Amino acid sequence: MSLQIGKPAPDFKGTAVVNGAFEEIKLADYKGKWVFLGFYPLDFTFVCPTEIVAFSEAASKFAERNAQVILTSTDSEYSHLAFINTPRKEGGLGGINIPLLADPSHKVSRDYGVLIEDAGVAFRGLFLIDPKGVLRQITINDLPVGRSVDEALRLLDAFQFVEEHGEVCPANWHKGSDTIDTKNPEKYFSKH
Protein backbone atom coordinates (compact mmCIF):
# COMPACT_ATOMS: atom_id res chain seq x y z
CA MET A 1 0.00 0.00 0.00
CA SER A 2 1.30 3.43 -0.93
CA LEU A 3 0.86 6.33 1.48
CA GLN A 4 0.18 9.77 0.13
CA ILE A 5 -0.51 13.04 1.87
CA GLY A 6 -3.98 14.29 0.98
CA LYS A 7 -5.31 10.78 0.33
CA PRO A 8 -7.29 8.49 2.65
CA ALA A 9 -5.21 6.97 5.43
CA PRO A 10 -5.00 3.18 5.42
CA ASP A 11 -7.72 1.67 7.55
CA PHE A 12 -6.54 -0.08 10.68
CA LYS A 13 -8.20 -2.31 13.19
CA GLY A 14 -7.09 -4.50 16.04
CA THR A 15 -7.08 -5.13 19.74
CA ALA A 16 -5.94 -2.24 21.90
CA VAL A 17 -5.53 -1.73 25.59
CA VAL A 18 -7.88 1.14 26.44
CA ASN A 19 -8.22 2.22 30.07
CA GLY A 20 -6.70 -1.06 31.21
CA ALA A 21 -9.03 -3.33 29.20
CA PHE A 22 -8.88 -5.04 25.81
CA GLU A 23 -11.01 -3.33 23.18
CA GLU A 24 -11.36 -3.75 19.42
CA ILE A 25 -10.70 -0.44 17.70
CA LYS A 26 -10.57 0.76 14.10
CA LEU A 27 -9.93 4.03 12.29
CA ALA A 28 -13.65 4.49 11.57
CA ASP A 29 -14.29 4.67 15.34
CA TYR A 30 -12.60 8.08 15.29
CA LYS A 31 -14.39 9.62 12.30
CA GLY A 32 -14.95 13.30 13.04
CA LYS A 33 -11.78 13.49 15.17
CA TRP A 34 -8.18 14.19 14.37
CA VAL A 35 -6.05 11.10 14.98
CA PHE A 36 -2.34 10.79 15.63
CA LEU A 37 -1.45 7.17 14.88
CA GLY A 38 2.01 6.58 16.26
CA PHE A 39 4.31 3.59 15.98
CA TYR A 40 7.09 2.56 18.32
CA PRO A 41 9.46 -0.44 18.22
CA LEU A 42 8.78 -2.48 21.36
CA ASP A 43 7.33 -2.54 24.84
CA PHE A 44 9.79 -2.64 27.75
CA THR A 45 12.59 -0.78 25.95
CA PHE A 46 14.27 2.57 26.55
CA VAL A 47 12.98 5.46 24.44
CA CYS A 48 9.51 3.97 23.93
CA PRO A 49 8.23 4.47 27.48
CA THR A 50 9.40 8.10 27.46
CA GLU A 51 7.35 8.79 24.33
CA ILE A 52 4.27 6.89 25.50
CA VAL A 53 4.28 8.62 28.88
CA ALA A 54 4.80 12.04 27.25
CA PHE A 55 1.88 11.56 24.84
CA SER A 56 -0.26 10.12 27.64
CA GLU A 57 0.44 13.08 29.92
CA ALA A 58 -0.65 15.39 27.08
CA ALA A 59 -3.85 13.41 26.33
CA SER A 60 -6.06 16.22 27.65
CA LYS A 61 -4.31 18.75 25.37
CA PHE A 62 -5.08 16.55 22.37
CA ALA A 63 -8.67 15.99 23.56
CA GLU A 64 -9.18 19.78 23.86
CA ARG A 65 -8.32 19.92 20.15
CA ASN A 66 -10.72 17.09 19.18
CA ALA A 67 -7.81 14.71 18.67
CA GLN A 68 -6.97 11.19 19.79
CA VAL A 69 -3.49 9.72 20.07
CA ILE A 70 -3.20 5.98 19.43
CA LEU A 71 0.19 4.32 19.75
CA THR A 72 1.02 0.91 18.33
CA SER A 73 3.82 -1.62 18.18
CA THR A 74 4.13 -5.16 16.89
CA ASP A 75 3.77 -6.47 20.45
CA SER A 76 0.64 -8.33 21.54
CA GLU A 77 -2.13 -6.78 23.60
CA TYR A 78 -0.92 -8.95 26.50
CA SER A 79 2.53 -7.40 26.33
CA HIS A 80 0.91 -3.94 26.18
CA LEU A 81 -1.17 -4.70 29.27
CA ALA A 82 1.87 -5.95 31.19
CA PHE A 83 3.82 -2.85 30.07
CA ILE A 84 1.01 -0.57 31.26
CA ASN A 85 0.65 -2.38 34.59
CA THR A 86 4.38 -2.37 35.37
CA PRO A 87 5.41 0.63 37.50
CA ARG A 88 7.49 3.32 35.78
CA LYS A 89 10.35 2.80 38.22
CA GLU A 90 10.56 -0.78 36.96
CA GLY A 91 10.60 0.11 33.25
CA GLY A 92 6.86 0.08 32.64
CA LEU A 93 4.27 2.75 32.05
CA GLY A 94 2.43 2.67 35.36
CA GLY A 95 -0.93 3.45 33.72
CA ILE A 96 -1.64 5.67 30.71
CA ASN A 97 -4.43 7.77 29.19
CA ILE A 98 -4.15 6.69 25.54
CA PRO A 99 -4.85 3.44 23.68
CA LEU A 100 -2.01 1.05 22.82
CA LEU A 101 -2.91 -0.89 19.69
CA ALA A 102 -1.43 -4.37 19.23
CA ASP A 103 -0.08 -5.23 15.77
CA PRO A 104 1.32 -8.77 16.13
CA SER A 105 0.47 -9.58 12.48
CA HIS A 106 2.50 -6.50 11.40
CA LYS A 107 -0.33 -5.50 9.03
CA VAL A 108 -0.82 -1.99 10.38
CA SER A 109 2.92 -1.30 10.52
CA ARG A 110 3.34 -2.63 6.98
CA ASP A 111 0.34 -0.65 5.65
CA TYR A 112 1.82 2.55 7.07
CA GLY A 113 5.29 1.80 5.67
CA VAL A 114 7.15 1.72 8.99
CA LEU A 115 7.80 -2.01 9.43
CA ILE A 116 11.42 -3.12 9.55
CA GLU A 117 10.73 -6.50 7.96
CA ASP A 118 13.83 -8.38 9.11
CA ALA A 119 13.51 -7.15 12.71
CA GLY A 120 9.71 -7.37 12.96
CA VAL A 121 9.47 -3.96 14.63
CA ALA A 122 8.33 -0.52 13.48
CA PHE A 123 10.23 2.71 13.02
CA ARG A 124 8.96 5.62 15.13
CA GLY A 125 6.26 6.82 12.74
CA LEU A 126 3.67 9.47 13.55
CA PHE A 127 0.75 10.00 11.18
CA LEU A 128 -1.79 12.81 11.45
CA ILE A 129 -5.19 11.85 10.06
CA ASP A 130 -7.91 14.49 9.75
CA PRO A 131 -11.58 14.06 10.77
CA LYS A 132 -12.45 12.86 7.25
CA GLY A 133 -9.82 10.09 7.38
CA VAL A 134 -7.33 11.91 5.14
CA LEU A 135 -3.60 11.65 5.84
CA ARG A 136 -2.24 15.14 6.50
CA GLN A 137 1.25 14.67 7.95
CA ILE A 138 3.91 11.96 8.25
CA THR A 139 7.00 11.88 10.44
CA ILE A 140 9.24 8.82 10.65
CA ASN A 141 12.26 8.65 12.94
CA ASP A 142 14.98 6.03 13.15
CA LEU A 143 14.83 3.92 16.30
CA PRO A 144 17.14 5.81 18.69
CA VAL A 145 15.40 9.22 18.61
CA GLY A 146 12.04 9.96 20.24
CA ARG A 147 9.40 12.39 19.03
CA SER A 148 8.24 15.72 20.40
CA VAL A 149 4.74 16.07 21.84
CA ASP A 150 5.05 19.85 21.54
CA GLU A 151 5.76 19.54 17.81
CA ALA A 152 2.80 17.20 17.36
CA LEU A 153 0.54 19.74 19.09
CA ARG A 154 2.00 22.58 17.00
CA LEU A 155 1.29 20.65 13.79
CA LEU A 156 -2.23 19.86 14.93
CA ASP A 157 -2.87 23.53 15.74
CA ALA A 158 -1.50 24.55 12.34
CA PHE A 159 -3.58 22.08 10.34
CA GLN A 160 -6.69 23.01 12.29
CA PHE A 161 -6.03 26.73 11.72
CA VAL A 162 -5.62 26.16 7.98
CA GLU A 163 -8.87 24.15 7.87
CA GLU A 164 -10.79 26.86 9.72
CA HIS A 165 -9.31 30.01 8.21
CA GLY A 166 -7.91 29.04 4.80
CA GLU A 167 -4.62 30.83 5.46
CA VAL A 168 -1.25 29.06 5.52
CA CYS A 169 1.19 28.72 8.40
CA PRO A 170 4.85 29.71 7.91
CA ALA A 171 7.88 27.98 9.39
CA ASN A 172 7.99 27.86 13.19
CA TRP A 173 4.36 28.98 13.41
CA HIS A 174 2.64 28.64 16.79
CA LYS A 175 -0.99 29.24 17.71
CA GLY A 176 -1.57 33.00 17.83
CA SER A 177 1.31 33.83 15.47
CA ASP A 178 0.88 35.58 12.15
CA THR A 179 -0.25 33.48 9.21
CA ILE A 180 -0.16 34.13 5.48
CA ASP A 181 -3.26 35.04 3.49
CA THR A 182 -2.45 33.60 0.06
CA LYS A 183 -4.60 36.32 -1.55
CA ASN A 184 -2.57 39.03 0.20
CA PRO A 185 0.85 37.60 1.15
CA GLU A 186 2.41 41.07 1.14
CA LYS A 187 0.69 41.78 4.46
CA TYR A 188 2.72 39.02 6.12
CA PHE A 189 5.99 39.59 4.26
CA SER A 190 5.98 43.34 4.89
CA LYS A 191 6.18 42.57 8.63
CA HIS A 192 8.52 39.58 8.56
UniProtKB/Swiss-Prot annotation:
Processing and modification events after translation: The enzyme can be inactivated by further oxidation of the cysteine sulfenic acid (C(P)-SOH) to sulphinic acid (C(P)-SO2H) instead of its condensation to a disulfide bond. It can be reactivated by forming a transient disulfide bond with sulfiredoxin srx1, which reduces the cysteine sulfinic acid in an ATP- and Mg-dependent manner.
Keyword NAD: no
One CC-aspect GO term: cytoplasm
Residue numbers carrying Phosphoserine: 105, 148
Reaction catalyzed: a hydroperoxide + [thioredoxin]-dithiol = an alcohol + [thioredoxin]-disulfide + H2O
GO molecular function, one term: peroxidase activity
Annotated GO biological process: cell redox homeostasis; cellular detoxification of hydrogen peroxide; hydrogen peroxide catabolic process; negative regulation of transcription by RNA polymerase II; positive regulation of p38MAPK cascade; positive regulation of transcription by RNA polymerase II; response to oxidative stress
InterPro entries assigned: AhpC/TSA, Peroxiredoxin, Peroxiredoxin_AhpC-typ, Peroxiredoxin_C, Thioredoxin-like_sf, Thioredoxin_domain
Result, substituting residue 191 to D: Peroxide reduction reduced
Protein EC: 1.11.1.24
Effect of residue 191 to R: Inactivated by 1 mM H(2)O(2)
Record keyword DNA repair present: no
Keywords: Antioxidant, Cytoplasm, Disulfide bond, Nucleus, Oxidoreductase, Peroxidase, Phosphoprotein, Redox-active center
Annotated active site: 48 (cysteine sulfenic acid (-soh) intermediate)
Domain Thioredoxin, chain residue ranges per copy: 3-161
Subcellular location: Cytoplasm; Nucleus
A family per Pfam: 1-cysPrx_C
Functional note: Thiol-specific peroxidase that catalyzes the reduction of hydrogen peroxide and organic hydroperoxides to water and alcohols, respectively. Plays a role in cell protection against oxidative stress by detoxifying peroxides and as sensor of hydrogen peroxide-mediated signaling events. Relays hydrogen peroxide as a signal to the transcription factor pap1 by inducing the formation of intramolecular disulfide bonds in pap1, which causes its nuclear accumulation and activation.
UniProt miscellaneous comment: The active site is a conserved redox-active cysteine residue, the peroxidatic cysteine (C(P)), which makes the nucleophilic attack on the peroxide substrate. The peroxide oxidizes the C(P)-SH to cysteine sulfenic acid (C(P)-SOH), which then reacts with another cysteine residue, the resolving cysteine (C(R)), to form a disulfide bridge. The disulfide is subsequently reduced by an appropriate electron donor to complete the catalytic cycle. In the typical 2-Cys AhpC/Prx1 family, C(R) is provided by the other dimeric subunit to form an intersubunit disulfide.
Record text on subunit structure and interactions: Homodimer; disulfide-linked, upon oxidation. Interacts with srx1 in response to oxidative stress. Interacts with pap1 via transient disulfide linkages.
Family per similarity comment: Belongs to the peroxiredoxin family. AhpC/Prx1 subfamily.
Protein name: Peroxiredoxin tpx1
Encoding gene (name): tpx1
